Amino acid sequence: MENRMNFQTSVELPAGMPSVSHADHILLMGSCFAENIGRQLMDAGFQLDLNPFGILYNPLSVSSALREIIRNKEYNKQDLFAYKDLWHSPMHHGSFSAFTPEETLHAINSRLHHAYKKLPELNWLMVTMGTAYVYKQKESGQVVANCHQLPESHFLRYRLSVEEIVEDYTALITEMSALNPELKWLFTVSPIRHIRDGMHANQLSKSTLLLAIDRLQQLFPERVFYFPSYEIILDELRDYRFYADDMLHPSPLAIRYLWERFSETFFSSETKQVIVAVQDIRRDLAHKPFHPESEAYQRFLGQIVLKIERLIGKYPDLDFQKETELCHMRLNP
């Protein structure tokens, strides 16, 4: 039989990777691509904390945030600055900014302390690096996570070297391994292109990140792993129909495809079955009936409660508290 033509270059998925299950506790840090995969994991019923500092783009901001979590830092007003009617933290995404320092500090410290409490039970730390370019504040010498629209003259912008990233993360991985010997690291490079300096500079930036991660894998072969999200978008989905309107961010379809490839790499057949069961329950609850007081809908809700109880009985790590409360709220007394 004649071979069929192949119009796609397939990326070989890494073999022999440790599995990810619903019993695992996961922390995701990094760029908006970490948000994309994190939302998929959340919808699939996994236990996770997603970007407790908000979206972070460069590797040094991620490592600084992790060190502050390790130390359970308590932020105070001196860590903030006021600009354009809002109080900001240079270490945090703009989603933490607020009109008063008290509001900003409450948002920051509550997320940081929650992440600190979860550290001892973490199984996976998933880090997505977006760019090797950093902004260093001239006055303080601090690499910031977000400029918060301050004038560019306040900052020195430069590209990190492979050696800088490797040295920083070697110390961090060693420190965190001493605190949690079971912790595994999964690195990805965001497929989102940063084109401020042009495509060539973007390639140099991404290459720096890839080389640094490869070196960390060599140094920590039992702890550090890599998922080729960057390569999958650039090779398997080499078409602008897989991008959003800005032609830079992956489209929802591309994110779903990456999720499928992620699932192939890390999920057992049993885990995939649990995901289907979780999503079925949530899909049922999303159904809006015309007659919520009807006997038929009340029976339908009762069946959902039974499904939840059976699934939790088999997989006690699943969290269906919100779904159970919603069912009981809708059930007639």
Where on the chain are the PLM-derived regions?
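Active-site segments of SGNH/GDSL-like serine hydrolases
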Residues: 132, 174-203, 236, 278-285, ...
